[in-house]
Amino acid sequence: MLLLLLLLGPGSGLGAVVSQHPSRVICKSGTSVKIECRSLDFQATTMFWYRQFPKQSLMLMATSNEGSKATYEQGVEKDKFLINHASLTLSTLTVTSAHPEDSSFYICSAR
């Protein structure tokens, strides 16, 4: 089994409030996990996805703008971590074929 811990992340930048769902996931190795990030107080033009391993610093994975492809940071596997920002209030992160080394905190923020 694989444990992916997902946090509710406060907004950044202009103080956007976001909500993540689900808040935590346990899944079998090899399955995919989808995380939704919603901007609650305004339409977010930019969403940021981060991950944090235990006892390590927060790492920016990717930035996305509504209707555009995400811009991934160096070293992030874009085929493994699929980001979709289809509307101004919603972005999703799908971890494909999750394995124990993907266990992490996944956090979003909006601006």
Swiss-Prot record:
GO annotation (BP), single: adaptive immune response
Main location: membrane
Ig-like domain segment(s): 16-111
GO cellular component, one term: T cell receptor complex
Database matches in Pfam families: V-set
Keywords annotated in UniProt: Adaptive immunity, Cell membrane, Disulfide bond, Immunity, Immunoglobulin domain, Membrane, Receptor, Signal, T cell receptor
Protein name: T cell receptor beta variable 20-1
Species, as recorded: Homo sapiens
